[in-house]
Regions:
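Catalytic or ion-coupling anion/metal-binding cores of large enzyme and transporter domains
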Residues: 1-200, 204-235
Length: 235
């Protein structure tokens, strides 16, 4: 369950300095010592009695020291890049089944936010209107994409990385809260809430969001709520 994700993420530090949150690339991790280095640092959190494909336990596999470690790429356990993991799951009236935010790639100034929804009913609707100069949207609004989950006609494409509306991008806006039942590339950066469940296509609360509705997000409280009367959601 997603509640377990929060527990694991809160206990597991970010040790690898890779894009989009860092400066290096995957090949740099390989040259810095690879996953073996990372696993050795994470030993306090691992079940070391698990068997590997060689028949050895994980502990036995990690006994030997790495020949080389580049600490600019892989930090030590006691000197992490971030003390908590990159993912956090959010729950509330907008996502009773949960949603996921990659906090390590998000803007911390948006972690506690309340804003007005700007809704796109589908990928086609998004494509047709996102760059419209007459789109009613401001930097503190929250973009919402519906019907992009696994049960939708779109079948959950990597569409969660909603573009910043052209009129805002031209004024210098680099990030804003974006919410959908879609997914996105692991290399994407932004304050983007994904995998909202239940999804819009099966009648989840996401499908009920209208332009102008208020949405509140709190990473601290692990919450994401649609601020309308419960009776309206029930109907």
């Amino acid at each position: 369950p997603l509640q377990q994700l929060n527990k694991l993420s809160d206990e597991t530090p970010v040790l690898i300095d890779l894009k989009p949150t860092g400066d290096h690339y995957m090949e740099d991790l390989f040259k810095a010592g690879g996953l073996g280095v990372v696993l050795r640092e994470l030993k306090p959190l691992l079940n070391l009695e698990c068997l590997s494909v060689t028949g050895e336990t994980l502990n036995e596999r990690l006994q030997s020291e790495a020949a080389y470690v580049n600490r600019e790429v892989v930090r030590s356990f006691d000197q992490p890049i971030q003390k908590m993991g990159g993912l956090v799951s959010l729950f509330g009236s907008l996502a009773p089944g949960g949603a996921i935010l990659k906090r390590s790639a998000a803007d911390p100034t948006l972690f506690e936010s309340e804003g007005k929804a700007v809704v796109f009913k589908s990928l086609e609707d998004l494509a047709n209107r996102i760059d419209d100069p007459d789109l009613e949207v401001e930097a503190h609004d929250i973009l919402v994409l519906q019907n992009a989950g696994p049960m939708s006609d779109a079948a959950m494409p990597e569409a969660g990385y909603l573009p910043i509306p052209k009129k805002l991008a031209q004024s210098g806006v680099k990030d804003m809260i974006r919410i959908s039942d879609a997914r996105m590339s692991g290399t994407a950066y932004g304050t983007i809430v994904l995998h909202v469940t239940p999804e819009a296509a099966v009648g989840g609360p996401l499908s009920l969001v209208k332009n102008g509705d208020k949405i509140k997000i709190s990473v601290k409280n692990r919450s994401i709520d649609l601020l309308v009367d419960e009776a309206e959601l029930d109907n």
